[in-house]
């Protein structure tokens, strides 16, 4: 039985949006936001300008969607790696946090995340968008982890939400330092040592 017209249209629209995001992501990483035009994006995606403006208000709106896409991919990667590591070598929740922070800092040296999220993101979208991104993908995850760690008595009882915001602020600053550094790998190592010392200090005595 043939699919309804509405279903086919929805599938086509989703495919067009995915093509635009894929093309824009590659261009924003390779050339940066300022050097990428909407003409570049529609040519790479092989769609019309009308299709682009049907899905996105303007180039900034497209960039916002790409940045969220990159951030979501990173979270999936971090969570997946953490689950795999926990299965292979079970450790304490504090150990898992230390490993997760190290993995996040490694990702900050990655081209997609560094260029789109760390370099262009704060400049193009401003601090409000950055705060929204960190809250959506960082604060909620850390709050849940901290609550579990407190319940298992690995760390002292503290306001989990406030502590999560403070840790995310540290991670955010570290990531921006790495993204703007002349030597990102060295900055990553230095920031990693400092953050690890802070996290170890959370251990319940």
Predicted regions and their residues:
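Short coil/turn segments at alpha/beta junctions that flank glycine-rich nucleotide-binding fingerprints
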Residues: 30-34, 111, 152-153
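Short hydrophobic/aromatic patch on the recognition helix
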Residues: 46-56
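Alpha-helical DNA-contacting segments of helix-turn-helix folds
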Residues: 64-70
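Amphipathic alpha-helical segments used for helix-helix packing
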Residues: 108-128, 176, 180
């Amino acid at each position: 039985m043939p699919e309804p017209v509405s279903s086919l249209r929805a599938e086509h629209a989703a495919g067009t949006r995915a093509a635009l995001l894929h093309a824009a992501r590659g261009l924003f990483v390779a050339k940066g936001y300022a050097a990428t035009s909407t003409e570049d994006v529609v040519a790479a995606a092989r769609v019309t300008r009308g299709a682009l403006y049907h899905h996105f208000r303007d180039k900034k709106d497209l960039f916002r969607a790409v940045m969220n896409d990159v951030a979501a991919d990173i979270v999936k990667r971090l969570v997946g790696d953490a689950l795999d590591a926990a299965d292979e070598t079970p450790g304490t929740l504090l150990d898992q946090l230390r490993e997760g922070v190290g993995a996040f800092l490694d990702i900050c040296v990655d081209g997609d995340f560094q260029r789109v999220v760390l370099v262009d993101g704060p400049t193009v979208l401003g601090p409000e968008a950055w705060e929204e991104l960190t809250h959506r993908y960082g604060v909620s995850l850390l709050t849940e982890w901290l609550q579990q760690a407190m319940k298992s008595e690995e760390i002292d009882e503290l306001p989990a939400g406030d502590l999560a915001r403070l840790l995310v602020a540290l991670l955010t600053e570290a990531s921006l330092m790495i993204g703007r550094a002349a030597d990102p790998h060295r900055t990553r190592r230095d920031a990693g040592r400092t953050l690890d010392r802070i996290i170890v200090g959370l251990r319940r005595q």
